[in-house]
Amino acid sequence: MHSRTVFFVSDGTGITAETFGNAILAQFEMKPRHVRLPFVDTVDKAHQAVRQINHCGEVEGKKPIVFTTLVNMEVLKTLQDGCQGMLLDMFGTFVHPLEQELGIKSHHRVGRFSDASHSKEYSDRIAAINFSLAHDDGQSHHDLAGADVILVGVSRSGKTPTSLYLAMQCGLKTANYPLIPEDFERRQLPPALEPHRKKIFGLTIQAERLAEIRNERRPNSRYASLDNCRAEIAGAEAMMRRSSIRWLSTTTKSIEEIATTILQELRPERLVY
């Protein structure tokens, strides 16, 4: 049973409100019900949002929490005047003080990604996603020279989600390559990766956690057995040490933490823009 309903109201996609709101909610031991209300860009839609929020409060007997990134003042005022939830206006909290500090007025432009599809950054991100999908799980060795990052590790150690995050969020062309027992027997990196060693970053994981993940995919198989997981991890870590590959354990880290560590180690310039 959720302890409270949280609404994310935006005149755009609602992703900014949801991301910011979830970062704040993560500080509290609770499991709220999430409701995203995107494209609330007219007064009529704001009235609909107010009715939905207030009805939720009446049914649950608790004030909903409402995070909003509305920039249209008329739409925002409609929400402020009618909403019976706890309203947290993110843009209002930060934009006005920044206007005063910078001495300039903000655009109050709806949708911060409104022109994104025509930007070089957007095109680069799409290219990075396509590259990462084409080079997922060692599918292709073609154009590894064009990779920004190459992730290596045993199967199910977190390579694919990290690759896609680096592509989507950072615009990095990221290949990932599984390390398998045949690689451990050779005691060296796969030949296709050797020329690109400076781009390689390794991911490892605790054997118990790996066995748990693999058992969800192939229950009671040798692939998922704890002994096999231990052997593969030991082989992969030994190889990375011999090859002087930087690596980290993904066991207790989020994708965001993993990706940020990789950026710090391999592409620190991407942290400054």
UniProtKB/Swiss-Prot annotation:
EC number: 2.7.11.33, 2.7.4.28
Organism domain of life: Bacteria
Binding annotation for ADP: 153-160
Enzyme class: transferase
InterPro entries assigned: Kinase-pyrophosphorylase, PSRP
The entry's keywords: Kinase, Nucleotide-binding, Serine/threonine-protein kinase, Transferase
NCBIfam families to which the protein is assigned, alphabetical: PRK05339.1
This protein's name: Putative phosphoenolpyruvate synthase regulatory protein
Gene source species: Verminephrobacter eiseniae (strain EF01-2)
